[in-house]
């Protein structure tokens, strides 16, 4: 078995946890991450790490060149384009594709101040009902879209403490008091103090699941009487037995894959 046989895609803590299982099973693999931050998060995994974004055509070429037999999409739940390209590439190259996606916990909380949005545009429409200070805990990728959609609001961005991210915030017009560069997940107490300190009138977040500290983000917001808008996840492109929603489910799928590989 070579390192191209299995490809794990994603610079997330979920992807790293899957790699640990592959390490424990002595499976050779490659972890593909998009950014240096994702590479750093991989830590001391045993597999090969490749860094850089792959478009559809590049994915197909990589899969064929490395004779890949199994792809595990552990990319961020909201990385729709990555998942879409992976699905197409695996179909083209004839490679098995599994999707690992943590449970979202969206139904665990209900509250009059908790709103669910299906898109950024939907979230912007809801946010316009509230005060001027909008705290975004949705990552840095779509900040330009938020800026355009909520031009009349004061946007506060909680983002990763990465130089290129802070530079992007600055280029989009975020001031010194509007950029909060922090690496989560955070405790409920931390978030409660943070919301108070930044004087947020409304908080916008994503259904990040337990690993992303979803309840620790949302509950303190609601307890403080602050409206919270949660952007729901896109519908998974992979369904059935290849949609894995826990580490235990992945362990079972890995066992079946190893058994089939020996036949």
UniProtKB/Swiss-Prot annotation:
Alphabetical GO biological process terms: cobalamin biosynthetic process
Enzyme Commission numbers on file: 1.3.1.106
Known pathway: Cofactor biosynthesis; adenosylcobalamin biosynthesis; cob(II)yrinate a,c-diamide from sirohydrochlorin (anaerobic route): step 7/10
Protein name: Cobalt-precorrin-6A reductase
Cited PROSITE patterns: COBK_CBIJ
Keywords, in A-Z order: Cobalamin biosynthesis, NAD, Oxidoreductase
Domain of life: Bacteria
Function: Catalyzes the reduction of the macrocycle of cobalt-precorrin-6A to cobalt-precorrin-6B.
Catalysed reactions listed for this entry: Co-precorrin-6B + NAD(+) = Co-precorrin-6A + NADH + H(+)
Family note: Belongs to the precorrin-6x reductase family.
A single GO molecular function term of this UniProt record: precorrin-6A reductase activity
Transmembrane segments: none
One Pfam assignment: CbiJ
The keyword NAD is assigned to this record: yes
Classification lineage: Bacteria, Pseudomonadati, Pseudomonadota, Gammaproteobacteria, Enterobacterales
């Amino acid at each position: 078995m070579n390192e191209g046989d299995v490809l794990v895609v994603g610079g997330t803590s979920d992807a790293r946890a899957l790699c640990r299982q592959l390490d424990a099973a002595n499976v050779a693999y490659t972890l593909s991450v998009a950014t240096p931050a994702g590479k750093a998060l991989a830590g001391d995994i045993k597999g090969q790490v490749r860094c850089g974004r792959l478009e559809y055509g590049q994915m197909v070429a990589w899969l064929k060149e490395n004779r890949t037999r199994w792809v595990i999409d552990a990319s961020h739940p909201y990385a729709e384009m990555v998942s879409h390209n992976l699905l197409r590439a695996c179909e083209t190259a004839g490679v098995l594709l599994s999707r690992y996606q943590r449970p979202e916990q969206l139904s665990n909380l209900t509250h009059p101040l908790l709103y669910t949005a299906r898109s950024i545009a939907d979230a912007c429409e809801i946010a316009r009902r509230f005060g001027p200070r909008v705290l975004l805990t949705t990552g840095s990728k779509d900040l330009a879209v938020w800026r355009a959609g909520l031009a009349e609001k004061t946007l506060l961005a909680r983002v990763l403490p990465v130089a290129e991210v802070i530079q992007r915030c600055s280029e989009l017009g975020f001031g010194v008091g509007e950029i909060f560069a922090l690496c989560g997940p955070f405790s409920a107490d931390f978030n409660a103090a943070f919301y108070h300190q930044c004087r947020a009138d409304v908080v916008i977040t994503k259904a990040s699941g337990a690993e992303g500290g979803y309840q620790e983000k949302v509950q303190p917001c609601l307890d403080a009487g602050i409206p919270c808008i949660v952007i729901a996840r896109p519908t998974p492109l992979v369904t059935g037995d290849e949609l894995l929603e826990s580490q235990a489910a992945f362990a079972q799928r890995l066992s079946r894959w190893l058994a089939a590989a020996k036949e």
